[in-house]
From Swiss-Prot:
Domain of life from the UniProt record: Viruses
Main location: virion
Cellular localisation: Virion
Sequence segments annotated as region (Binding to NPH-I): 169-249
Protein name, UniProt field: Cap-specific mRNA (nucleoside-2'-O-)-methyltransferase
Length: 333
């Protein structure tokens, strides 16, 4: 890996300051991957998002409606983290697939095994009234092959727009990956929001999270065009090909790889119920607790030693097979 000196990572898509033409040959590269990397990616992004809402006084007393949540192993960590901070949250986890048994038996967690449609969304809104709703969506439909088609993506994004319109959440975190320009069908609309980049995404993932906080006005929509798709592809390829393969030499941390640098800046914003002498100590504590929870071996993190014994994930099969499958260089995940 090449070295670089950086003041901060790219946290949002708009911050990426360069671009690179996509090279199909990159598909032949062997990707480095951590165990349970998909759950790690989701956990870090959602912990950052919910901590941001906590900082704004939005989180306490809310119901998190998570659509497309299975297997949801990482959600147990999120639930326990905020529960231990004394933040009152209810969780409604909805997916047509079954959830990890680690989520069973929790009074503040409701598990629903079904897919959503407009009628069911209206019933959720009626059931939860007058509670404030925080929406997290990780919907993903694939009608064939390993990757969702552009038609699949457009269907998912139309459904996410309906979720916002009906549930009227105070905040949302939506799945977002722009269709590739060579697979373009038509222009479409997504909610206006901040496009958060994700550490520990697969090597050439073009996916990000669309974060929004709503202040009472109608949902603002942004039109996405083929020209936008070209911009997304070039900037995300630059991020994945060049930036994420760097070692950050001025980053004082046991592992100086860019994704750990990115993770550091996310975890530094997270509240804890104990004090630490430095921000670095807090981030190390959080990272180690997350890696232990997800059973990610300490050998994957350089120079982190003296870890407590890791707990076992309830079942190796609790992780969706689709999340562990080999993906194309322009991965949706």
């Amino acid at each position: 890996m090449d070295v670089v000196s950086l003041d901060k990572p790219f946290m949002y898509f708009e911050e990426i300051d360069n671009e690179l033409d996509y090279e199909p040959e990159s598909a032949n590269e062997v990707a480095k991957k951590l165990p349970y990397q998909g759950q790690l990616k989701l956990l870090l992004g959602e912990l950052f998002f919910l901590s941001k809402l906590q900082r704004h006084g939005i989180l306490d007393g809310a119901t998190v409606v998570y659509i497309g949540s299975a297997p949801g192993t990482h959600i147990r960590y999120l639930r326990d983290h905020f529960y231990n901070l004394g933040v009152i949250i209810k969780w409604m986890l909805i997916d047509g697939r079954h959830h990890d048994p680690i989520l069973n038996g929790l009074r503040d967690v409701t598990l629903v095994t079904r897919f959503v449609d407009e009628e069911y969304l209206r019933s959720i809104k009626k059931q939860l009234h007058p509670s404030k709703i925080i929406l997290i969506s990780d919907v993903r439909s694939k009608r064939g092959g390993n990757e969702p088609s552009t038609a699949d993506l457009l269907s998912n994004y139309a459904l996410q727009n309906v979720m916002i319109s009906i549930l009227n959440p105070v905040a949302s975190s939506l799945k977002w990956r722009c269709p590739f320009p060579d697979q373009w069908i038509k222009d479409f609309y997504i909610p206006h929001g901040n496009k958060m980049l994700q550490p520990f995404a697969p090597s050439y993932s073009a996916e990000m999270r669309l974060l929004s906080i709503y202040t009472g006005e109608n949902m603002r929509l942004t039109r996405v065009t083929k020209s936008d798709a070209v911009n997304y592809e070039k900037k995300m390829y630059y991020l994945n090909k060049i930036v994420r393969n760097k070692v950050v030499v001025n980053f004082d941390y046991p592992n100086q790889e860019y994704d750990y640098f990115h993770m550091y800046f996310m975890l530094r914003t997270v509240y804890c119920n104990k004090t630490f002498p430095t921000t670095k100590a807090k981030v190390l504590f959080l990272q180690q607790s997350i890696f232990r929870f997800l059973n990610i071996p300490t050998t994957s993190t350089e120079k982190v030693s003296h870890e407590p014994i890791q707990r076992k994930i309830s079942s190796k099969n609790s992780m969706s097979k689709n999340r562990n499958s080999k993906r194309s260089v322009r991965s949706n995940k």
